Design a protein with these regions (language model features):
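Helical "substrate-binding/catalytic lid" subdomain
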Residues: 7-136
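Long, positively charged, glycine-interspersed low-complexity recognition regions
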Residues: 139-141
């Protein structure tokens, strides 16, 4: 597809990848909520399979998710860390340059950072601050 002058195609692809970050994050969070509702004993893979056929959220990303949910051993063997290859960062940078709000893409990128333990120090400080001002409990490492 020809988008326009030099660089416009790369720009469009960058935005595509930023949208992908947000969509992936929403799908993963939704299935985490399904998994977390233990009293319903929901079959996440079966729900995802139903959504693949005629649901408004049907997509290739949902197909990949359902495939992953169907292999519990493989899913359990994966560390809960998500890399980024730069496109999300570039999209967020562009949003800042334009002054255009892009909270979903930004939070999806931040979630990837947090998955790598980059927030551990900040979270420890938050816990200690809460204990300091309100006597809230902290969980020991």
């Amino acid at each position: 597809m020809h988008c326009g002058p030099a660089g416009s195609g790369h720009f469009a692809k960058m935005i595509h990848n930023g949208i992908e970050y947000g969509m992936m994050q929403a799908i993963a969070e939704g299935f985490a909520l399904i998994q977390g509702k233990a009293e319903f004993a929901l079959d996440a893979a079966a729900i995802g399979e139903a959504w693949r056929h005629g649901s408004v959220v049907r997509s290739w990303l949902l197909d990949l998710t359902v495939d992953a949910l169907g292999d519990a051993d493989a899913l359990a063997a994966i560390a809960p860390q998500v890399a980024d290859s730069g496109e999300g960062r570039w999209t967020v940078d562009e949003a800042v340059r334009q002054g255009t709000p892009a909270p979903v893409i930004t939070l999806a990128l931040m979630s990837r950072f947090a998955s790598r333990g980059n927030a551990d120090h900040a979270n420890r400080l938050l816990a200690l601050m809460r204990r300091g001002f309100g006597g809230h409990t902290v969980v020991r490492a």
